Design a protein with these regions (language model features):
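Hydrophobic positions on the alpha1 helix immediately C-terminal to the Walker A/P-loop
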Residues: 36, 40
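Domain-level recognition of nuclease-like catalytic cores that cleave nucleotide substrates
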Residues: 377-397
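Accessory nucleic acid-recognition modules appended to NTPase machines
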Residues: 180-339
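Hydrophobic anchor at the beta1->P-loop junction of P-loop NTPases
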Residues: 25
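Pre-Walker A adenine-sensing motif
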Residues: 4-18
Length: 397
């Protein structure tokens, strides 16, 4: 498999090198966390200073004896070298039960610069503060962006064709070694099955696997739609599946914990407040939708929405769904003091469709940038202060 340097993530690690924080690399299975760690090791090896690199991959058989936290702790201490910068990197740390006891003990000694990776529900953003005694810095790794997809395949022109393929096959890098779409979808389905069964069903001791799977697939089919545990429960009950609102809420949380779905909460633009009821959920990668639910209903509008949402998150934005009276804005993207309003569409060549997209933006009475991202196949242009940009072009900016 060809490897590419994911510069944005690598630069994050380089910026954090030497800081006292525990650096935690999180993300969905097979999104490239282990490869990122290897890239960082290569960077450390290129330094002129004396660096003692202690690299432990708990998936590898040679480290099988470290799957007990006392043994892991002793091994790390034994590898320490005086007079050098000692860097500890533990890949798939969750495979060692109670790993946090070993890592916390090492951290309190102040002798290692610590980096760890973990998949899915075992290293949650919300749990980092309670797992570790020290301050943590989280590096969130996503599947390949469109730019990374282009880099992997060495594509420097005919971007529209490449985008069409990216929409269908997504950004799971492990699938790229397979030459046919069917084989790529087989790979993605296997990753999905591992997440649901090995990670979530086993971790949370879910008894009704089919019920859990149904909710996941329902959410996949409804990316870009407003959902709540209550309306999901009612819909599934109509399909003769008895499931409570509380159970649905719990299952959605599990799927988010596994980085399979990301929530976009609603934000009231007039009242300047976040709304608790109804959210939208977007997949970590659109390939899961097609691999699991099939390609009969491509529904490009919502798929483009999903791609834009994930790209905004990659670029460091918090993403919300805007509400202005009875109108809806697809995304309110916030980053520190910056804010952007975005509408996403597959096709705005029809006048009524175009009006439906721009009218909510024109109703917003502030000076923040407003944008329509669509499949225009044209140069970027301005309409009444709203920037209209082709999605393929925007993803490459």
């Amino acid at each position: 498999m060809q490897l590419i340097v994911r510069k944005e993530y690598l630069n994050e690690l380089i910026e954090l090198y030497g800081t006292p924080d525990i650096k935690v690399i999180t993300g969905i299975r097979r999104s490239g966390k282990s490869v990122l760690l290897q890239e960082f090791v290569s960077y450390l090896q290129s330094l002129e200073e004396a660096v003692n690199i202690v690299m432990i991959n708990l998936q590898e058989l040679e480290f099988d004896h470290l799957l007990e936290y006392h043994a892991l702790h002793k091994y790390i201490l034994d590898q320490y070298k005086e007079g050098m910068t000692n860097v500890l990197l533990v890949d798939e740390v969750q495979l060692c039960p109670q790993f946090e006891l070993a890592i916390n003990s090492i951290y309190t000694k102040g002798i290692y610069d610590i980096y760890i990776t973990g998949s899915n529900a075992f290293l949650l953003s919300s749990d980092l503060a309670t797992l570790f005694t020290g301050r943590t810095m989280e590096i969130k790794v996503y599947p390949f962006s469109f730019v990374e997809y282009l880099t992997y395949y060495g594509i420097t022109d005919r971007y529209d064709e490449a985008f069409d393929q990216y929409v269908r096959t997504g950004g799971m890098p492990g699938s790229y070694v397979y030459k046919t779409e069917d084989r790529q979808y087989d790979y993605v389905r296997d990753v999905y099955s591992t997440i649901l069964i090995r990670d979530l069903v086993e971790k949370y001791k879910i008894r009704n696997k089919s019920e859990f799977t149904n909710i996941s697939e329902f959410m996949m089919d409804n990316i870009g739609n407003l959902l709540s545990p209550n309306n999901i429960s009612k819909t599934l009950k109509n399909d003769q599946s008895e499931i409570t609102r509380k159970t649905v809420s719990k299952y959605i949380g599990y799927l988010e914990n596994a980085f399979l779905f990301y929530e976009a909460k609603r934000y009231d633009l007039k009242g300047k407040k976040y709304l608790a009821n109804n959210s939208k959920y977007y997949l970590c990668d659109t390939s899961f939708r097609y691999a699991v639910n099939g390609t009969r209903n491509m529904d490009f509008g919502r798929v483009y929405e999903n791609i834009v949402c994930l790209e905004l998150r990659r670029r460091g934005y918090e993403v919300y769904v805007g509400k202005l009276y009875k109108k809806e804005v697809d995304f309110v993207a916030k980053k520190r003091e910056a804010q952007i309003y975005i509408q996403v569409s597959d096709n705005i060549s029809d006048e009524k469709t175009f009006e439906r997209e721009y009218s909510p933006l024109l109703a917003i009475r502030d000076a923040y940038p407003k944008m329509i991202i669509a499949r225009t196949h044209h140069e970027t242009y301005d309409y009444k202060g709203v920037q209209v940009v082709d999605i393929c072009r925007w993803l490459r900016e």
